[in-house]
Amino acid sequence: HINHANWLCLSLLTREGHITSHHISVSIESKPRHTLRPLAVFVRIFTRAMPKYKLSYFPLRGRAEAIRITFAVAGVEFDDILVNPEEWFTKLKHSGLSPSGQLPILEVDGTVLTQSKAILSYLAKEFNLAPKGNLQQAQADSLAHVVNELETTLTEAYGEKDPERKEKGMKTATEEVIPDKCGYFEKILSANKNGFFIGEKLTYADIVVFTFLNSYFMKGKAEGIPEGLKKFPSLSAWYERVRTQPKILEKLKNPTDGFVDYIY
């Protein structure tokens, strides 16, 4: 089914429509068959079914929350499957559900993608949230990898079984590693001067950094700027700018039900 808006777009793209003021009407002139082929291509594009997305992860924000926020920003529906950790480690991990034996995974019409930052990069390209050009996309990937390092540092420290080593690891992460990376983010934002990490609009680089900082400092809550960021002026201003994006703020105020408490 092609609605009125789609016909308008089609007519503009093919330059075969006529638009009148006051009441917009669109007509497609009768043309020889060969000249209508571009129109047929656009019809297929406009009527193409949206893929079915299914995200599987533990009942945490963790490494999947930036993916959830990306869907929210794009306004795209997906199945948010919360996997019971005990069931995962005793049965599902080796079932073939995840080729890598890790979560999160994203199923796209049955095709399984693994690795959270690769999933984010894919969705960014699908939803027009990727920067322009290969160089800027590489910059976005670089920021995503920095966040991945932070997540790994926290996960390994938090999961340490020896109490003394755990305490030392968490102290290093919270007092040294995270402040150091916040300083790194501050430098990038100060240099860009456009209000976002890359270019002049929100990209998945902003989403992945924001989600980590919000999850770590605020436990996913929607309120204000974290105390830990206030000594970084550019980072603080950026955080508030991203936090108050309407779809992000709405998502923060309406988190996924069933989460358990975690370090990020």
Segments the model singles out, each with a brief description of its role:
Residues E164-E167, T256-Y264:
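Carbohydrate-binding/catalytic loop surfaces
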Residues F46-T172, E176-C182, A191-K193, F197, ...:
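GST-like domain detector, emphasizing the conserved glutathione-binding G-site
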Residues A140, F197-E223, K231-S236:
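GST superfamily/GST-like fold recognition
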Residues L129, K187-E200, A222, Q245-L252:
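Surface-exposed helix-capping loop/turn segments at secondary-structure junctions
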Residues S25-A49:
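Short, Lys/Arg-enriched N-terminal segments with co-localized hydrophobic residues
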